[in-house]
Amino acid sequence: MSRRPSSRYSEMPMRVTDSRMSLINATPQNKDNAFGKLNIPKPQSTTSERRTSFFGKGIGAGGQRNSMFGSYGGSEKMKDPRALHDKAFVQQCIKQLYEFLVDRGFPGSITVKALQSPSTKEFLKIYEFIYNFLEPSFQMPTAKVEEEIPRMLKDLGYPFALSKSSMYSIGAPHTWPLALGALIWLMDAVKLFGGQREQDLLFSDFSDELCDLEDRTEYNKLIMEYCSDTYNKFMQGADTFDDEDDDFLYKLKKLYNVDEALLHSQQEKHSMLMEHVERLERESQTDRLVGKRTEKLRLQTDLQKLQNYRCTLEAHKTGLENKSAGLTEELEAVEMQLEGLKQERTRLQHILENQKFTPADIERINRERNELQQTIHGLSQSLEEGEQLVWNEEVNLSKTKEKAELKVAEYNKLGRKLKLIPLSAENACGHDFEIRADYSATTITQYKTQIQNPLKNMMVEVEEEFSRLSNVNLSLEETVEQVKSNIFDKENDIKQLKEQIRKVDQQLENAMQEMALEDDKWAAELDSAETHKKLFEKNVMQGIEEAEEEVKAAQQQYHVVVQETNEKNRMVVKNMTDLFSSTVNHLFAVEKHCDEQLKRFDKLKDIVREDEADINQLTDLVENFIKKANSL
């Protein structure tokens, strides 16, 4: 019976405190105890009209008690006390679920990465696998799964609500933690059910000498009797269980043959050691423990940041893999479509060769076909060259960005070393000297006003301060008054600078909003282009189908009306010519779009170069400032 303060389900005040020494020190416990570590704190009486039960709902002398895990008609919804929106807790739950599935032989491949954001199909498969341990004949229903799963969890006694809408998007960041909590609860239920099946809960008589203490049977029986007695009194309204605690402690000591004298001597020795530790702590001048705790908190914070960054990288990697898979599927579909067009062209060529034309007509058609093929081949080469050029420009742009980010990181590291970063640093004076990876058009102007000019002003102020302090050494009293006056002036300057920083932050936020609107605009244009592409493909397929129908009609009437067949064949040739003309126009439009993208990349490259030059200038300025500061 483990009472964990970090997972209390009741929102009422605690009735007991942990001031009493745990019985773990008095009994030789095993680590694999099915009921957890024994901890019976000294109860402290408090008045409470409404108490919470974990197993049901009853009415006692103290008033009505509510059940946390299932009720007999209550309709109020409970709030989940687990930190399901904490990334560290969610990762821990995912790891537990992964280990459980692997240990129990989950069919199919499962990874921790797949459990970060599973699909609805994977969730249903995991749920069915875990539920089969409770009911081996269970089969997942085929209809209205989003209604059946919350109902089954409620029937099992799951105390928290799982909405039907969350079942439609089970892998979303706001719904997956709730579903994960339900799976963890179901997994714990399976473990508890399996533990109860492995051991016999119908205990024999306590005085039976054939009991095996190695199997913990007698100890588990004592635990169950103690829980039953205390729970009955609790449901009757009692808040203290001193008699039950004493009786339980006596039986445990009798069961394990505890030496009272040895226990008493160990307690006295523990008290003496605690007094000695307190005396040493009072006598010590520096508390190294506080420093170590501070360092531990700092390291834990850094570890959490690294874990968050790793999760972000994994999510980015997953997105790139999904995008690559989508592009591969799209490429395969285009290749299949191209193969179909080639077969159709071969069939039409065969039909065309079997038809009766004059040598002049055949020569003219072949000449036009060769010209169109050469045009298409040239345009295809131009398109490939344009795509390769765009790819090279993107690679160069990414390399330039990486170099700029390295220099920015070096600058920020130097600023932290000089205590200029962050905003609350010792030498920042209310300025934000940190450079962030932002490539907007107003970034350079903002950094000049926010970083370069304040740094120059700080250098001038440092030089003036050094000269002033050299002269101030002549008179100590005048120095004190002058320093006080300067402090007052600096406070006013800091207030003004903070106001300026607030205005600059507001301008930055407006610029970010404009960038977001620009991104939405580009996304809308991209959707429009995709729609145009689909419409064009639909028209092409429709034209091909019409051509096929016309060819079939011409074959049926070939021997009846030769002249009419020739006319329809000419119409087919005309339609194919129009189709090739539309294709050529589309290729010209694609080439024009590639040229526009190249111009845009050139502009971005120039902006990055300007940013790199400004960063080099700021780096030189900071190095000069360091040299002057060191010379002081």
UniProtKB/Swiss-Prot annotation:
Record text on subunit structure and interactions: Component of the NDC80 complex, which is composed of ndc80, cdca1, spbc24 and spbc25.
Name by which UniProt lists this protein: Kinetochore protein NDC80 homolog
Keywords: Cell cycle, Cell division, Centromere, Chromosome, Coiled coil, Kinetochore, Mitosis, Nucleus
Principal place of residence: nucleus
Annotated function: Acts as a component of the essential kinetochore-associated NDC80 complex, which is required for chromosome segregation and spindle checkpoint activity. Required for kinetochore integrity and the organization of stable microtubule binding sites in the outer plate of the kinetochore. The NDC80 complex synergistically enhances the affinity of the SKA1 complex for microtubules and may allow the NDC80 complex to track depolymerizing microtubules. May play a role in chromosome congression and may be essential for the end-on attachment of the kinetochores to spindle microtubules.
Molecular-function annotations in GO: kinetochore adaptor activity; microtubule binding
Organism listed in the record: Danio rerio
Gene assigned in the entry: ndc80
Nucleus in keyword set: yes
Subcellular location: Nucleus; Chromosome, Centromere, Kinetochore
One GO location term (cellular component): Ndc80 complex
